[in-house]
Amino acid sequence: DIYKFYKLVENESHPHDYIDSQPEINERMRAILVDWLIDVHTKFELSLETLYLTINIIDRFLAVKTVPRRELQLVGISAMLMASKYEEIWPPEVNDFVCLSDRAYTHEQILAMEKTILNKLEWTLTVPTPFVFLVRFIKAAVPDQELENMAHFMSELGMMNYATLMYCPSMVAASAVFAARCTLNKAPLWNETLKLHTGYSQEQLMDCARLLVGFHSTLGNGKLRVVYRKYSDPQKGAVAVLPPAKLLSEGSASQHS
């Protein structure tokens, strides 16, 4: 079973805390990059697999290579190019990315960075991102469209925020489904079927789910609004506009865990 395999190997391809080893890059810069890439991803109408793989490539690369601040966007562009080639039938061309970055980088620079990243990551692009788990866990929740949209929204909020990297991909995915169920007041919030399919109990998901709901509650005030805009669209059920889960908001969750 491919999911059992992914569960076994997810920690091998999951980057852990690296930001302190990057002298010129901080969590905020990473968030700005991811925010921009989610926008680019939407413009190109790429698959969600491509988006999640892009962010995984960036984080794994930053965990093994010091990158100057001026090259961070170049890493992002090259990662999305690689992920697109891997996941899409019709990937964007290098020149599309040159134009998108307002010609900040040349065709040659993007291809050279792509090669550097591939070599550093030893050409490993078949990795379990939160997305592979999310699709399965949403199915196990027997969702309506609103729950599906909300779980994707929660997961992309997690992707934006460096703090989420503390948790392995399957836990982020399970927490996104749990946080979505809490936000939409689904009863029960968690059940044996979900526990069986995810491998996590409600208690195990509390911390990560609380983190995701915390991102939701501060989202409207921030400058990085791409995920908020994307999920405020009626096509996505405007789930971003719904009030954050009270059960998991700071202060109240301790009584329920």
Swiss-Prot record:
<dbReference type="InterPro" id="IPR006671">
    <property type="entry name" value="Cyclin_N"/>
</dbReference>
<dbReference type="Pfam" id="PF00134">
    <property type="entry name" value="Cyclin_N"/>
</dbReference>
<comment type="similarity">
    <text>Belongs to the cyclin family. Cyclin AB subfamily.</text>
</comment>
<dbReference type="GO" id="GO:0000307">
    <property type="term" value="C:cyclin-dependent protein kinase holoenzyme complex"/>
</dbReference>
<dbReference type="GO" id="GO:0000082">
    <property type="term" value="P:G1/S transition of mitotic cell cycle"/>
</dbReference>
<dbReference type="InterPro" id="IPR013763">
    <property type="entry name" value="Cyclin-like_dom"/>
</dbReference>
<keyword id="KW-0131">Cell cycle</keyword>
<dbReference type="InterPro" id="IPR048258">
    <property type="entry name" value="Cyclins_cyclin-box"/>
</dbReference>
<comment type="subunit">
    <text>Interacts with the CDC2 protein kinase to form a serine/threonine kinase holoenzyme complex also known as maturation promoting factor (MPF). The cyclin subunit imparts substrate specificity to the complex.</text>
</comment>
<dbReference type="GO" id="GO:0016538">
    <property type="term" value="F:cyclin-dependent protein serine/threonine kinase regulator activity"/>
</dbReference>
<dbReference type="Pfam" id="PF02984">
    <property type="entry name" value="Cyclin_C"/>
</dbReference>
<dbReference type="GO" id="GO:0051301">
    <property type="term" value="P:cell division"/>
</dbReference>
<dbReference type="GO" id="GO:0005634">
    <property type="term" value="C:nucleus"/>
</dbReference>
<dbReference type="InterPro" id="IPR046965">
    <property type="entry name" value="Cyclin_A/B-like"/>
</dbReference>
<dbReference type="InterPro" id="IPR004367">
    <property type="entry name" value="Cyclin_C-dom"/>
</dbReference>
<dbReference type="GO" id="GO:0005737">
    <property type="term" value="C:cytoplasm"/>
</dbReference>
<keyword id="KW-0132">Cell division</keyword>
<keyword id="KW-0498">Mitosis</keyword>
<keyword id="KW-0195">Cyclin</keyword>
<dbReference type="InterPro" id="IPR036915">
    <property type="entry name" value="Cyclin-like_sf"/>
</dbReference>
<protein>
    <recommendedName>
        <fullName>G2/mitotic-specific cyclin S13-7</fullName>
    </recommendedName>
</protein>
<comment type="function">
    <text>Essential for the control of the cell cycle at the G2/M (mitosis) transition.</text>
</comment>
<dbReference type="InterPro" id="IPR039361">
    <property type="entry name" value="Cyclin"/>
</dbReference>
